[in-house]
Amino acid sequence: MIQVLLVTICLAAFPYQGSSIILESGNVNDYEVVYPRKVTALPKGAVQPKYEDAMQYEFKVNGEPVVLHLGKNKQLFSKDYSETHYSPDGREITTNPPVEDHCYYHGRIENDADSTRSISACNGLKGHFKLQGETYLIEPLKLSDSEAHAVYKYENILKEDEAPKMCGVTQNWESYEPIKKASQLNLTPEQQRYNPFRFVELVLVADKGMVTKNNGDLNKIKTRMYELANNLNDIYRYMYIHVALVGVEIWSDGDKITVTPNVDDTLSSFAEWRKTHLLTRKKHDNAQLLTAIDFNGPTIGYAYIASMCHPKRSVGIVQDYSPINLVLSVVMAHEMGHNLGIHHDHSYCSCGDYACIMGATISHEPSTFFSNCSYIQCWDFIMDHNPECIVNEPLGTDIVSPPVCGNELLEVGEECDCGTPENCQNECCDAATCKLKSGSQCGHGDCCEQCKFSKSGTECRESMSECDPAEHCTGQSSECPADVFHKNGQPCLHNYGYCYNGNCPIMYHQCYALWGADVYEAEDSCFESNKKGNYYGYCRKENGKKIPCAPEDVKCGRLYCKDNSPGQNNPCKMFYSNEDEHKGMVLPGTKCGDGKVCSNGHCVDVATAY
């Protein structure tokens, strides 16, 4: 644990106000000028790092004093963070720059519970903060006086294009009635507090158009991406999700895909490139493309729904339509929200007095809040689909930055970390020291009850199927033992299926999940349609092309069900959606014949499948 530094920045009352000025965010018609003056109080003999872990800024907005507390965003970069660009002859150049002493911060405004703030302190102060419900931006003025900064409201930026901007994702709300019911649920503080964090390892990609737009200045593009990621991390922490930047890629020598104004084509091409190229050389969970191209119509973003962790479809595309990082961050958070199973908000969804991130149309003032509907949908997706790539919390030894008590991450030298003393809700943990209180054996974990290890034999993870036995506490640890499955290929459900990654996938259950009761696996003749290789009947996709099923593989393509429900008589019912082509396909590991299972669109011998 390191000594927390207190840095006071005195900002003199602005000596003048401007009526209009051109800043990085655009033409601002009303702003205040402030002069930061930094005073550092360090313990005697302490070595001052380039960028402190904690800082405090004091200044005035509209003549009223504001105290801004900032803490370095320790979760911004991953241990294996890398940057890739290309030489003029197309050679890939990848580096692993040091990122421990970076200059990107989150924080809070004193005495304003609803305040949000995301600031970079690389060359002066740049970013945004919300104060008393209004969004302000701050950035250095490019004057000979390098200490001058502009502070202005978002509403005072002159917008060149006032036309409404939209996400390209469409959906049928008539078919999503459960969301309305879910939006009416109220989570208790205890439920929210103990929701486990998830970790999204993100790669940001900039196309050749971004390079041209920024006059070939790769450092400028990278700085922009750092600021976008810092904002994303701040936005998603309220969803109990940490977004860590694991890589930046810039297509400096030319686009690696065909980037067109058609969002369907561009998203599909980017998804295929991510699967076949990016994922083979860089471990990550999600990739977002930032492009300078102007998408057709009012669309500025597009993504696949419920696709997080999918090797191909865990992607989104965002148009660089605004110079304001906060605006682009909200659009990117919106598209990543689709990847996390979140749909557009409806009239019954609420963010209190604010607009919501998942509105189909981007609001006049960008919101950094997800609605109650979004929270429910996101965690329904996480709990129901279990996207495994975002489950693993980085080990304390994997975090390259110095441990900081109070950041809610268990790091080297800490026994617990429940946040700041003001926010800590853990009765077992001393928030000031990140050590367990006297008499406590544990402060967290599925095998920790009232600060003591649970008794040996206490069930800590229930069985999800006969292929996934329950786990029990050992009595010697607060952690539940590792989740162990029966061996893949072991017969299950009275030989109707074979175990696969802890489940027993059979077609009847998959039909039930799609259509409900009274729907069963269809006759074999229905599956012959998978030989067509058309938009719905195929076994797999290769380089964007749908490959028809071989005769022996027809039961490993599109799923066909027989609907016997009242008023229905459909012997070959199937599900297909342009938004999610994979939904409705027979799941991997499903039995496709005696001693055979589906694997990569083929019906193979279970003895050799795994």
Swiss-Prot record:
It is found in: Secreted. Residues 402-488 form the Disintegrin domain. In the absence of calcium ions, is autocatalytically degraded giving 29 (p29K) and 45 kDa (p45K) fragments. In presence of calcium ions, the p45K is not detected. Its EC number is 3.4.24.-. This is Zinc metalloproteinase-disintegrin-like brevilysin H6. A motif (D/ECD-tripeptide) lies at residues 466-468. GO terms for biological process: proteolysis. Keywords: Calcium, Cell adhesion impairing toxin, Disulfide bond, Fibrinogenolytic toxin, Glycoprotein, Hemorrhagic toxin, Hemostasis impairing toxin, Hydrolase, Metal-binding, Metalloprotease, Protease, Pyrrolidone carboxylic acid, Secreted, Signal, Toxin, Zinc, Zymogen. It comes from Gloydius brevicauda. Glycans are attached at residue 372. Gene3D superfamilies: Collagenase (Catalytic Domain) (3.40.390.10), Disintegrin domain (4.10.70.10). The metalloproteinase domain which is released from the cleavage of the disintegrin bothropasin may be unstable. The modification Pyrrolidone carboxylic acid is found at residue 192. Residues 198-394 form the Peptidase M12B domain.
